[in-house]
Structures are given as structure tokens and as C-alpha cells.
């Protein structure tokens, strides 16, 4: 099931651009199709993952970020339910619930930053 709610706090061109990038990024996980990632991720992208606790693993560089997100997006039997995407300028916050193959779920948030129309930073946090 594909779902999405994007709220734009600023309403300027930069926010609209960021909202479009987040829409395409969210589709990767909603549709289990990572093919768009190469066009969305900057060479110097950095992800701070949700695991391991307490600080999460750091993934640096386009290839490392695409590899991580591709693995998450294509995990069999899983799904992301998007609760909200909030955009303000070059920044976005994505609230989500991730359902694992065994039916258990976890809620979390990604703090995203875009520069030059590419994702340059993603910091993931989960409840738990």
C-alpha cells in the first residue's frame, strides 16, 4: 500500500524541490524499488543509521548509502508506512513505521538534508 503526506512549511522553490526529492525517496521504500537512488544521492552523502545502539553506524559516500537503502527497500516481507513528511527549505523530517517480515513493527524518524537537488545527509532514529 502506497501512502504519503508531505507538508511544506515554507512554500518556496527550495522547499518544493526538497518535497519532490523526498517523494521520490519515499517511493523507493513504498514500492520496494531502489532504482531511483542513484539519481537522488550525493557523492558525499552520509547516513547515521538507527543501529547499533546507541549511536548507529555511519555510512559515508554515495555507494555505501545506496547499498544500505537498497538492502532495506528490498527486504522481503517488509513494509514502511509513512506517517508524515515535513519539509522546510533544504531539510525534511520523515516519520514512519517499519513492519518486519514477522509482523512486528518499530516507529522512527529520518532527519534529511538536501543540497544541489541531492540527498546529502540522513540521520535515523527509532523508538525503543
Feature-to-residue mapping (PLM):
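A general structural signal for well-ordered secondary-structure junctions
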Residues: 35, 47, 78-79
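A short gly/proline-enriched turn/hairpin at secondary-structure junctions
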Residues: 46-58
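Alpha-helical interaction segments
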Residues: 14-19, 27, 58-60, 86-87, ...
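Contiguous, function-dense segments enriched for cysteine-driven chemistry
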Residues: 62-64
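A beta-strand edge to alpha-helix "cap/lid" segment located at domain peripheries
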Residues: 2-14, 52, 66-128
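Short, low-complexity N-terminal intrinsically disordered segments enriched in polar/charged residues
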Residues: 1-43
